[in-house]
């Protein structure tokens, strides 16, 4: 056979040296077929078995050897597809064997698979009739980044956030039992997602309900970053003991010595381990689950045997498998954090490339043309390090988003002041509250979409007590390819109604830095919201300043002062730049030369600059327009409406036209951030169209 350019010398699970090309003959062994790839193909690879599959029913007749060939073809296809479209990468490569085994054994979609988070569902999409559409994933009008019920009957539950699968699967199981429908429900959850309290709430109830539920714990020692905490150490103990709870033909647990699996080099977390663990030493067994594992999640014959027997066991069952994030692609195995997700490759027509070099080239090209533009997460990271060097009371908390929130440097410089609490948003918020009662000043770095999960704690444990906690809210606004599940478009609505909360929205990197400082220095509960991605290129003027709380700034005025139509455009956050571009174009158009537009950078959502709002009446403003990257209902514009209509006597008399521009009352589908903004009428052209309609 001819050597494939995509394979290299590697080690299989049994330690056998591999240098063989992709094969389709059933005589190949498991060890021979488990390939490691070094390169991402630029052209569509040959995948004859995969190409013949239109749905899970097509693999039911496959032999075990054919399934193992399919695994290699699927892995190679996902490498190619990721290079074409980008997307979540490492998690998908790690569950290919499991995905194939589940669809082979289960009668999907009659039997139902629930994927936690959904980062790992690309292979599932391919096997369920979406192979030819995978190149559109995360693109406008293409496949979604996560399982979505509206996309396929095989996507049994919509996901995107963590730790929801067992609750959803339990609900399905109980409903099926009530309707006397004997179907299997399998929940696939990672060890990172297992750190979320919701997962344990569901497991507790599953035992209480004695539900027939199959939970598969995909343990790769990672979420986006490395898994941490006591639960992670417990899983390591189960692995490092050298024993496993196997399953007999009768379904009974059997404690036995685990075969040596050289493919895994687990982190050693314990200086001493017990020789032989007892079943009662197992957390899942103690809760009341029937536990089997740990098993090699990349061994197809083993997976088929174990899952086939486990799904016949009544009651809640957990099968614990070990996998490698980025399995089969050497650079991703070596750097699972860096390869959690990738951008699509450059468009040059290269047959194959060394992806480590390609990744460096992408990074270089990304930095070119952007000057010194920083990501907002980098601005936060710089502020955090600068302030911590001056104030030893600063402590920083994140729920498993060290890299994404820009906290790597802080964690290295101040490890004793950095607290990654894993995927536990509720705990993160109340933890900060507890810290604040002892005289320190905690900052909680959290994505807007995930702050939703800690809302009760924010009200009850922070704001009600007016505790000195600052929330650095990243990914506020539309987030692009991750779509509606990750959009940060509700935070203003649920924050500004909470007493004692101050809320700031910076227009650029410099304001972000100084508003973070302003909120940190304030004695009370505060929040600064900022978007995903890079800023405008504004330089940060150090040292850190304190802005006046509740003060807006008139940024610019366009159009003649004698114009009969005077429009005040109240822009919140990064929409200031959009407002200025729109106003400049609008007033330069001869059609609108009877209009003057002043751009007001509101800076603060709460408190509003009510003094400035009152002066607008004195200036004879005829139109007031608010502009925000947030839902209109309950957002910053609503706050302006409430003040003008209920608390301003002057406006009760003059009654200027009031108009709100923001995100409409619908979930915004995935696409690029620019496409999403255009979809909502929040790009420059969209804002101009809306202003023209208002002025006409």
Language model regions located:
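Cofactor-binding active-site loop characterized by glycine-rich and histidine/acidic residues
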Residues: 88-209, 376, 393-394, 399, ...
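Glycine-/acidic-rich phosphate or pyrophosphate-binding loops and their flanking alpha/beta elements
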Residues: 278, 305-308, 340-341, 373-390, ...
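N-terminal amphipathic, basic-rich helices that act as targeting or association modules
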Residues: 6, 30-126, 286-289, 296-300, ...
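Peripheral docking tails and interdomain loops at the edges
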Residues: 350-358, 480-482, 501-502, 631, ...
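Thiamine diphosphate
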Residues: 152-292, 302-309, 440, 460-492
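Non-catalytic terminal/interface segments that mediate subunit docking, oligomerization
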Residues: 324-325, 329-451, 457-467, 524, ...
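Long, well-ordered, tryptophan-enriched scaffold segments
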Residues: 30-44, 221-380
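Structural signature of the thiamine diphosphate
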Residues: 262-331, 468-474, 492-542, 684-696
């Amino acid at each position: 056979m001819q050597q494939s350019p995509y394979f290299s010398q590697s080690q299989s699970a049994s330690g056998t040296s591999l240098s063989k090309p992709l094969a389709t003959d059933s005589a190949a062994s498991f060890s021979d077929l488990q390939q490691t790839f070094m390169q991402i193909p630029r052209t569509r690879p040959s995948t004859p078995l995969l190409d013949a599959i239109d749905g899970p029913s097509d693999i039911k007749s496959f032999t075990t050897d054919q399934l193992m060939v399919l695994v290699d073809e699927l892995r190679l296809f996902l490498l190619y597809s990721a290079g074409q479209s980008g997307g979540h990468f490492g998690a998908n490569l790690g569950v290919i064997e499991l995905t194939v085994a589940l669809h082979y054994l289960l009668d999907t979609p009659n039997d139902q698979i629930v994927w936690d988070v959904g980062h790992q569902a690309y292979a599932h999409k391919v096997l369920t009739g979406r192979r030819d559409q995978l190149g559109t994933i995360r693109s406008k009008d293409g496949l979604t980044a996560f399982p979505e019920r509206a996309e396929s009957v095989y996507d049994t539950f919509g996901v995107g956030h963590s730790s929801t699968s067992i609750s959803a699967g339990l609900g399905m199981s109980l409903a099926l039992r009530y309707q006397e429908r004997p179907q299997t429900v399998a929940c696939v959850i990672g060890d990172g997602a297992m750190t979320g309290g919701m997962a344990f709430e569901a497991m507790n109830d599953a035992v209480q309900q004695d539900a027939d539920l199959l939970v598969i714990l995909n343990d790769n020692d990672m979420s986006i970053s490395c898994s941490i905490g006591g639960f992670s150490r417990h899983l390591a103990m189960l692995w490092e003991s050298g024993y496993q709870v196997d399953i007999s033909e009768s379904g009974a647990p059997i404690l036995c010595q685990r075969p040596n699996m050289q493919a895994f080099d687990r982190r050693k977390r314990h200086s001493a381990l017990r020789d032989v663990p007892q079943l009662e030493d197992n957390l899942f067994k103690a809760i009341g689950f029937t536990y089997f594992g740990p098993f090699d999640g990349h061994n197809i014959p083993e997976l088929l045997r174990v899952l086939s027997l486990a799904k016949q066991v009544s009651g809640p069952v957990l099968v614990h498998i070990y996998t490698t994030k980025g399995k089969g692609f050497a650079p991703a195995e070596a750097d699972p954090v860096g390869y959690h997700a990738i951008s699509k490759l450059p468009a040059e027509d290269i047959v194959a490339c060394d992806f480590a070099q390609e990744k460096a080239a992408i990074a270089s090209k990304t930095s070119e043309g952007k000057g010194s533009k920083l990501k907002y997460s980098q601005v936060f990271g710089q502020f955090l390090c600068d302030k911590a060097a001056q104030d030893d009371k600063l402590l920083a908390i994140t729920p498993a988003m060290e890299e994404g929130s820009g906290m790597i440097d802080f964690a290295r410089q101040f490890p004793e002041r950095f607290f990654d609490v894993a995927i536990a948003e509720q705990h993160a918020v109340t933890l900060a509250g507890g810290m604040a009662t002892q005289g320190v000043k905690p900052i909680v770095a959290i994505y807007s979409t995930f702050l939703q999960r800690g809302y009760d704690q924010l009200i009850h444990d922070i704001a009600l007590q007016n505790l000195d906690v600052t929330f650095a809210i990243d990914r506020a606004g539309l987030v692009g390819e991750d779509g509606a599940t990750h959009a940060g478009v509700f935070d203003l609505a649920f924050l500004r109604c909470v007493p004692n909360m101050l809320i700031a929205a910076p227009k650029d990197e410099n304001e972000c830095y100084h508003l973070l400082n302003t909120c940190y220095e304030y004695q009370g509960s505060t929040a600064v919201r900022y978007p995903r991605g890079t800023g405008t290129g504004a330089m940060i003027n150090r040292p850190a300043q304190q802005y006046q709380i509740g003060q807006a700034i008139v940024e610019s005025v366009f159009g003649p002062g004698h114009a009969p139509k005077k429009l005040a455009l109240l822009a919140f956050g990064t929409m200031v730049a959009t407002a200025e571009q729109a106003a400049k174009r609008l007033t330069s158009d001869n059609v609108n030369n009877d209009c003057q537009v002043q751009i007001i950078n509101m800076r603060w959502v709460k408190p509003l600059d009510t003094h400035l709002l009152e002066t607008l009446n004195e200036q004879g403003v005829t139109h007031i327009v608010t502009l925000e990257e947030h839902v209109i209902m309950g957002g910053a514009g609503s706050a302006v409406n409430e003040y003008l209509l209920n608390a301003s006597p002057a406006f009760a008399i003059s009654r200027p036209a009031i108009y709100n521009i923001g995100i409409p009352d619908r979930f915004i589908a995935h696409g690029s951030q620019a496409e999403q903004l255009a979809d909502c009428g929040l790009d420059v052209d969209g804002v101009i169209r809306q202003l023209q309609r208002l002025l006409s």
